[in-house]
Amino acid sequence: MKLTCVLIITVLFLTASQLITADYSRDQRQYRAVRLGDEMRTFKGARDCGEQGQGCYTRPCCPGLHCAAGATGGGSCQP
């Protein structure tokens, strides 16, 4: 009888802790996804223009920079 009560209490405790942990994890994952989306928007590779020193053969330079031709035929964004 005592063993049965201990097992029932243990199962209830573990179930409750699983439910609490699952609810907490769901909120954290949602926040992480939002943060990851913000990081992707500001990622250098996702920009539509070339930064200073980057090549300008396939995409235009960012505002305030112009494409300067290099000795090897390729250009780079310069102020």
From Swiss-Prot:
UniProt keyword terms in alphabetical order: Disulfide bond, Knottin, Secreted, Signal, Toxin
Recorded GO CC terms: extracellular region
Stretches assigned to coiled coil: none
Pfam family of the protein (one): Conotoxin
Disulphide bridges, residue numbers: 49-62, 56-67, 61-77
Location(s) in or outside the cell: Secreted
The record's note on its domains: The presence of a 'disulfide through disulfide knot' structurally defines this protein as a knottin.
Family: Belongs to the conotoxin O1 superfamily.
Protein name stated in the entry: Conotoxin 1
Species name: Conus vexillum (Flag cone)
